[in-house]
């Protein structure tokens, strides 16, 4: 579960390395799960890339440390909290996605992120 002030790693090559969640989008929501959109600020970034430090961006959650239960009865848990930066059209800002992503992204119409990911779990 991601909430305000949670730090996340960035799972793409947009230039940002770490994010801090400042708001979970949705009407009066407290926690974000896989596939949810958050507003975050960039805490660490590579120089001469697309995003700068302290820039406010939107991101979609692709991995969480909290256990994710599926309708089939399976549960899955990742080693880190990670997000991918997106633009206003819900397309990723980067051209590559690092690490596995959850299958629930396909159900939430983030097919571009799923196709860029090396592994879908």
From Swiss-Prot:
Organism: Prochlorococcus marinus (strain MIT 9301)
Entry keyword set: Ribonucleoprotein, Ribosomal protein, RNA-binding, rRNA-binding
Top-level taxon in the UniProt lineage: Bacteria
MF terms in GO: large ribosomal subunit rRNA binding; structural constituent of ribosome
GO CC annotations, alphabetized: cytosolic large ribosomal subunit
Protein's job: Binds to 23S rRNA. Forms part of two intersubunit bridges in the 70S ribosome.
NCBIfam families tied to this protein: rplN_bact
Gene: rplN
SMART domains per record: Ribosomal_L14
Cystines in this chain: none
Family of this protein: Belongs to the universal ribosomal protein uL14 family.
PANTHER family: 50S/60S RIBOSOMAL PROTEIN L14/L23 (PTHR11761), LARGE RIBOSOMAL SUBUNIT PROTEIN UL14M (PTHR11761:SF3)
Record-linked InterPro entries: Ribosomal_uL14 (IPR000218), Ribosomal_uL14_bac-type (IPR005745), Ribosomal_uL14_sf (IPR036853)
Name the record gives this protein: Large ribosomal subunit protein uL14
Lineage of the organism: Bacteria, Bacillati, Cyanobacteriota, Cyanophyceae, Synechococcales
One Gene Ontology term from the biological process aspect of the record: translation
Assembly and interaction partners: Part of the 50S ribosomal subunit. Forms a cluster with proteins L3 and L19. In the 70S ribosome, L14 and L19 interact and together make contacts with the 16S rRNA in bridges B5 and B8.
């Amino acid at each position: 579960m991601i909430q305000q002030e949670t730090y996340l790693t960035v799972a793409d090559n947009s230039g940002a390395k770490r994010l801090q969640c400042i708001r979970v989008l949705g009407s009066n929501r407290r926690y974000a799960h896989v596939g949810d959109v958050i507003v975050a600020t960039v805490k660490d970034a590579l120089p001469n890339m697309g995003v700068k430090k302290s820039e406010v961006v939107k991101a979609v959650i692709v991995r969480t440390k909290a256990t994710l239960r599926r309708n089939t009865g399976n549960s899955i848990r990742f080693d880190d909290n990670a997000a991918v930066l997106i633009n206003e059209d819900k397309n990723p800002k980067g051209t590559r996605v690092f690490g596995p992503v959850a299958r629930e992204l396909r159900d939430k119409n983030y097919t571009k992120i799923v196709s860029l990911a090396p592994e879908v779990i």
